[in-house]
Amino acid sequence: EPGMQIAQEEIFGPVLTVLPFSDREEAIAIANDVEYGLTGGVFSRDIKQALNLAQEIEAGGVYVNEWFGGSVETPFGGMKKSGIGREKGFEALDSYLQTKNISINLDEGDY
């Protein structure tokens, strides 16, 4: 059942949860009806359909026909209660920066 604890929480271990679904819309609803969103996976022979599903899954990363295909250049991070921000890639560098705008009037005058 989609409401089971094992299907609702992130379990950092070798666990696979398999839930039946009737159609595409139900599969997306089950995938997104959780408080977490670190990663997800889609396995399909139809790459176009898999890409469409991956775009609708609310997760920081979605793997298609593989598991953890990332590299040091690939941003990694979650959505929802899985956290915000990204590790690795240019997105990670942004988390170390504080952007500041300084505007200076260079006209000489009495101030």
Label every PLM stretch briefly:
Residues 1-111:
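Conserved C-terminal structural/oligomerization subdomain of aldehyde/semialdehyde dehydrogenase
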